[in-house]
Every structure is written in C-alpha cells, then in structure tokens.
Regions:
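Glycine-rich phosphate/diphosphate-binding loop of Rossmann-like nucleotide-binding domains
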Residues: 29, 33-105
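Short glycine-/small-residue-rich Rossmann-like dinucleotide-binding loops
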Residues: 112-114, 139-140
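Alpha-helical elements of the RecA-like P-loop NTPase motor core of helicases
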Residues: 54, 79, 117, 142, ...
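Adenosine-phosphate binding glycine-rich loop
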Residues: 125, 129-134, 138-195
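Conserved active-site and cofactor/substrate-binding residues in soluble primary-metabolism enzymes
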Residues: 19, 23, 47, 73-76, ...
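Rossmann-fold NAD(P) dinucleotide-binding segment
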Residues: 54, 58, 100-106, 115-136
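Glycine/serine-rich phosphate-binding loop and adjoining beta1-alpha1 elements at the start
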Residues: 1-39
Length: 195
C-alpha cells in the first residue's frame, strides 16, 4: 500500500497530468483568466443557467472569481443555480437586463439554448462604453454573432477557438500519461526487486 501511494505521489509531482482544460467550459474559464490575468476585480456575466453554466461557475470559482452575475430567461432558474454555490455571492437577473449587464462586465460567457444569436453588433454597439469586453460563446448553436468582433474593444471567442485549446491540452495529457506510465513501470520494477 505504501508503495502504491509513493507511486501515485511521484506521478502527481513529476508530471502535470491533471492540468490543462479538457472541456469547453474549463477551456473558456482558463482562456479568460489568461486574457485578464486575475479574476480578483473582474466583473463576469454568464448568460444562461443550464448545465454548461453550472460547470462554468464551478471552474470560475476554482479560479477565484468572485464578481459573477448570472442571467437567464427565467429568474427562478438563475436563482436555483446561484443557490448551488452558497459560499459565493452570485447576482442573478433575467435576460431582459442582458445588454446593461454585458456592457458592465469585463468578461461575458454565453451558454443559452437560444437558436439564434442573442448578441450582435446591432444590439451591443449602441450600448458599449469603450471599455474592453471579452465575450466567450460556449453555446451550440452560437449565441454571439461574428459581427460583434467589429466593435472596438470587444473581443469574441467561440466554441471553435476553445476546441483548439481543448485538443492541445488533450494531446499534452496523452504525453503526460505516457510519462506517468513510465514512472509507474519504474515503481513496479522496484517493488518486484524488493520482494
């Protein structure tokens, strides 16, 4: 048993096997953090309150996000999701307040079940105040029209951008798994020699 624990510890300390986002929601949170450097004073808006939003909130909280606003078509669903994270204060509202919330946010994540884009240049540009906004569209079909990239200081990322990050991280994990396997083989040989 002691040797098993030792082998596991070697894998954790000598490889980065558990690092790197391998889901779209974790990749979105990871990429957002790379772009803003810290979530300490970052206002984050999440549009949608389904499974993807729940996973996203988990990843954001694990990265120390503490200023989160969650909007949904129905306030009940937004409140229910926010209540699952009782140790973090999450503001809630309906999508009726979407544009005001998006403009006030530093980072926006969209993950609604809308079948048409809900954010586009025509509805967002008149509201923009000139501050930088990062928009991560993790919905399928897309919630954000590609034309919002034409708005000054609005930077949009979509599922395709995030899939590239996920694929890169999955390949990296495969490499690390091979390294971990080699370490475990060494530990098995040492154990066999000991017996």
């Amino acid at each position: 048993l002691k040797d098993s624990i030792k082998a596991g510890k070697r894998v954790r300390t000598e490889t980065n096997l558990g690092t790197g986002a391998v889901s779209i929601s974790s990749a979105a949170a990871e990429l957002a953090l790379m772009k803003v450097e810290s979530f300490d004073d970052c206002h984050i808006a999440i549009l949608g309150a389904g499974k993807m939003a729940r996973l996203l909130v988990q990843h954001l909280i694990s990265k120390r996000a503490n200023k989160i606003t969650l909007l949904n078509r129905t306030i009940k669903r937004a409140d229910e999701l926010a209540a699952q994270f009782g140790d973090v204060e999450i503001a809630t509202g309906t999508l009726d307040n979407m544009l005001e919330t998006v403009v006030a946010a530093d980072v926006v994540f969209t993950c609604t079940s809308a079948v048409e884009p809900i954010l586009h240049r025509e509805n967002l540009e008149p509201c923009c105040n000139g501050s930088q906004t990062l928009v991560f569209d993790i919905a399928v079909p897309r919630n954000v029209h590609s034309n919002i990239s034409a708005i000054e200081k609005v930077f949009a990322f979509n599922v395709d951008d995030l899939k590239a990050v996920v694929a890169q991280n999955q390949e990296s994990r495969r490499q690390m798994a091979m390294e971990a396997e080699a370490l475990l083989d060494e530990e098995v040989e040492a154990f066999i020699d000991w017996q």
